[in-house]
């Protein structure tokens, strides 16, 4: 299964509470922090909600 490397490129400060919770749930803490997440529907849905804050790369 492929994984997604998610990098926070914009701060979650001054964003909607739902968006801040998604950033925290994904394990992103600071700007330029990255995490590996599984490539599934739930993860893709969360990433879609905060697409304007992150950069996503596919890792094999």
From Swiss-Prot:
Gene3D superfamilies: Ribosomal protein L30, ferredoxin-like fold domain. GO terms for cellular component: cytosolic large ribosomal subunit. CDD domains: Ribosomal_L30. The keyword Ribosomal protein applies. Keywords: Ribonucleoprotein, Ribosomal protein. It holds the Pfam family Ribosomal_L30. One of its GO terms (biological process) is translation. One of its GO terms (molecular function) is structural constituent of ribosome. It comes from the Bacteria. Signal peptide: none annotated. InterPro entries: Ribo_uL30_ferredoxin-like_sf, Ribosomal_uL30_bac-type, Ribosomal_uL30_ferredoxin-like. Belongs to the universal ribosomal protein uL30 family. Part of the 50S ribosomal subunit. This is Large ribosomal subunit protein uL30. It comes from Levilactobacillus brevis (strain ATCC 367 / BCRC 12310 / CIP 105137 / JCM 1170 / LMG 11437 / NCIMB 947 / NCTC 947). The gene is rpmD.
């Amino acid at each position: 299964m492929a994984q997604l490397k998610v990098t926070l490129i914009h701060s979650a400060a001054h964003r909607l509470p739902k968006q801040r919770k998604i950033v925290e749930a994904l394990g992103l803490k600071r700007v330029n922090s990255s995490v590996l997440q599984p490539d599934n529907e739930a993860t893709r849905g969360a990433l879609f909600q905060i697409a304007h804050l992150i950069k996503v790369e596919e890792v094999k």
